[in-house]
Amino acid sequence: MHYEGNKEAKGYTKSISETEQLVRANLSKDGKTLDITAGYVKEYGAKDISKFEFLKDLTSLAMGTNLMGSQGVKYLAQSEVLVNLTSLNLFYNQIGNDGVKYIAVSDNLLSLQILNLTDNDITDEGAIFLAKFLPLFTNLIRLDIRYNKIKEEGKEALRKVQEKISLKHLLLDRVEGFQVKA
């Protein structure tokens, strides 16, 4: 059963020690890379991860298929621990437009070079909002936003901003693939 008030659906039943155990088991020896794809940490697990001080040197975070929703992304985007990230992979997390907005306005994620938001129920609203803030992400060279619900208006906003910034690879949908800037 999945609904907004369901604590289990949000990951509330997983203890912080369980989340920490999962993170430590999947953290690279140098502490720079963490891949917990399909770890299903959900919203509260993302909250725990955002506070783990031992992740302060993390540069690459892969958290696809963790179903954290927009609130989980809010914790990551506002984390004072995860400020060194250069790669963030959040495919299939049901973040929607609200989640994209948390990322777009985050001062803590400005070091990102690679951002994957594939399959997250993002619409034109989220794409247009993200496009407004992309110029602040001066290090971003790859944005993967395929398999969302973005129509032509949102795609056009992202294409226009790509012309003005350092974004070299813009992946909008499965048909057109890479939009490479020369």
Task: Describe these PLM feature segments.
Residues S15-R24, E43-D57, S70-N84, N97-S111, L136-T138, ...:
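Leucine-rich repeat
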